[in-house]
Design a protein with these regions (language model features):
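Long, charged amphipathic helices and adjacent flexible linkers at domain junctions
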Residues: 128-163
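Adenosine-phosphate binding glycine-rich loop
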Residues: 3-112, 116-118, 122-123
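C-terminal non-catalytic interaction/assembly regions of soluble proteins
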Residues: 56, 112, 116, 152, ...
Length: 169
């Protein structure tokens, strides 16, 4: 069974209570001290970022579905070490990890592009994003201070295109 006990601060049933009855139960709550915290911080900021970046006329169902699918895709992928360190445990998709954690740095550069694409595909965008790769890179840069330095180095390397010739012998 799948149980979403969303009452806060005390869920209708705790994961311990549910697992005492059914050890295979998948339980999600709104609390950060239990696995599978369902919290609007996982969706709203990134949904809005994608919508704002395309100057969307409205947030339509397709954009919300794109947000949900991006979250589901992230949950199935390997969890970065930095997230595991923040939670003090190795996380992988399964009963106790069905949704990414709020501290997953991938959220900022995976959800807004999905939302923006859906908005552009459905005509909600007033200002479509032309360079999606550049957009994703700009989102990554916001979370990683070294990304802007590396981006500059890569840009210089691409522009100079120097050749290196190695002599034999």
């Amino acid at each position: 069974p799948v149980i979403f006990a969303m009452a806060n601060p005390d869920p209708e049933i705790t994961p311990e209570e549910a697992h005492a009855v059914r050890s295979d139960a998948i339980v999600a709550t709104g609390r950060s001290d239990y696995p599978n915290q369902v919290n609007n911080v996982l969706g709203f900021p990134y949904l809005f970022r994608g919508a704002l970046d395309i100057h969307a006329r409205a947030i339509n169902d397709e954009m919300k579905i794109a947000c949900a699918r991006a979250l589901a895709d992230l949950a199935r992928e390997e969890v970065p070490d930095e997230v595991a360190l923040a939670y003090g445990t190795k996380l992988s998709f399964g009963r106790d990890y069905i949704i990414p954690t709020p501290f997953d740095p991938r959220l900022i550069y995976r959800i807004p592009p999905a939302v923006a694409r859906a908005g552009m595909d459905t005509g909600a965008a007033r200002r479509p994003i032309v360079d999606m790769d550049g957009y994703e890179l700009s989102l990554k840069t916001r979370m990683d201070p070294t990304a802007s330095i590396l981006r500059g180095i890569n840009a210089r390397a691409r522009s100079s295109q120097a050749r290196i010739i190695f002599a034999e012998g």
